[in-house]
Structure formats: structure tokens, C-alpha cells
């Protein structure tokens, strides 16, 4: 029984490690320090908040464009018509931002990055 429990625990830990690695390994990922630098150097045209309206209302990056992930597929091209626009995407954990970034890239946007982690790191 102990051996079986150990194998299950080991398998769960391996899956967890893979998911963490996958979450933060993308050519579109930037660290909070890199994001701050891009913003400071004015290399970002649009800061995109993909959280829910309630999350956005609780606090957001100044001048962030708010498009919840659920609405992004059908509103992005209207609200951000130039597909060469430099876009920095954020959410609370990086998961929705990653999804949103992949969606934007699939729609033809060529200069999209997302913050691996919480947007709160931008304000510190």
C-alpha cells in the first residue's frame, strides 16, 4: 500500500510540475520586471486586462483596456484594429492572459506578450 501511495503521489507531483512549467514557458511570456521595462520605455501601445468586470473594478493597471477573456474572440478586432499594435496582456495568475495571447496571435496579432503572474507585480 505504501508503494502504491508513493507512486500516485509521485505521478501527481510530476503532472503538477509539468503544468507549472507549461504555464510559464511560452515565447510570449514576459516577467513583471520585463513588463515594467517595456512600459517605462513606452514600447507598449495597449495594456490589456482580460479579467472579469468584478476583478477589474476591484483594481487595475491605469489606462488598461478591459476586455474579459470571454468577450475577446469577438471584440478584439473592433477595439484593437491594428494587428501590429504592441499589446501587453495581464490577469490575476497568467492563465487567462496566456489564453488571450494565444487567441490574439491566432487572429493575426504580431506583437503580443503576457505577464506570467499577477498584474499586481506591475504596481510594486
Ranges and model annotations:
Residues 32, 36, 69, 73, ...:
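Extracytoplasmic/secreted envelope proteins and their assembly/folding machinery
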Residues 76-123:
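Catalytic cysteine-centered active loop of the rhodanese-like fold, especially the PTP/DSP P-loop
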Residues 53-93:
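Extracytoplasmic/periplasmic/luminal assembly and interaction segments
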Amino acid at each position: 500500500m505504501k508503494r502504491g501511495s508513493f507512486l500516485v503521489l509521485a505521478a501527481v507531483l510530476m503532472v503538477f510540475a509539468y503544468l507549472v512549467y507549461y504555464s510559464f514557458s511560452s515565447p510570449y511570456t514576459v516577467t513583471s520586471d520585463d513588463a515594467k521595462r517595456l512600459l517605462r520605455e513606452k514600447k507598449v501601445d495597449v495594456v490589456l486586462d482580460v479579467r472579469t468586470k468584478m476583478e477589474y473594478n476591484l483594481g487595475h493597471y491605469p489606462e488598461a483596456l478591459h476586455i474579459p477573456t470571454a468577450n475577446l474572440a469577438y471584440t478584439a478586432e473592433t477595439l484593437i484594429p491594428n494587428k501590429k499594435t504592441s499589446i501587453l496582456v495581464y490577469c490575476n495568475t497568467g492563465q487567462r492572459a496566456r489564453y488571450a495571447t494565444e487567441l490574439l496571435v491566432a487572429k493575426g496579432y504580431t506583437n503580443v506578450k503576457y505577464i506570467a503572474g499577477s498584474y499586481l507585480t506591475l504596481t510594486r
